[in-house]
C-alpha cells in the first residue's frame, strides 16, 4: 500500500532529541538544539530509560538531555519511549549541518551524500515500530534540531526520514543498516 508522503499525512512514527523542561506528571516540553519546542505527552504504555537502563518518569528532570520516540503530530509527540541521557553514538555524517527554522530565513538547497536514485517525493510506505524508531534515532544522531514526523520505506529498502521544524535538512536518507547516507531539502 502506498501512502502519499506529505506534511498532511497525519500522525506517524517519529521523535525528537533535546533538553527537557516544564516536567509534569503527564509530560514535558522538549527544546531542540535549534530552539524548537516540542510538547511531549506521556501515554500509559510509555517506557523510560536512563542511558541504557530501565527507568521511570522521575528520571526526566528539567535540563536533562532526552531522546523521545513515539507518534508525532505536528509539534506534539505522544511518547512510546523516552531515553534520558541517551548514549552518544559514532554516527558518520554525509555532510551539512541542521539549519534551524527562522521566519524569513532562507534554507538550503544543498544535497549531501547519497540520495537514492529512484527517490520520488511522495512514494514509499510509512514505516512504524522498531524500524521507524531505528531510522529516527539514526537521523537525529546526525542531524539533531528538528522533529521527525514520519519515516517512509522506499522501494530500494532505504528510508526517507522526514524532518520538520528546520530549514534544512527536510529529508534524511537512512539505509537498511540504519546508517545516514544522505540529506536534502
Positions of PLM-derived features:
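Exposed beta-strand-loop-beta-strand "reactive/processing" segments of non-cytosolic proteins
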Residues: 147-177, 184
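Short, non-transmembrane alpha-helical segments in secretory-pathway proteins
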Residues: 126-148
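A short macromolecule-binding patch
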Residues: 35-48, 169-177
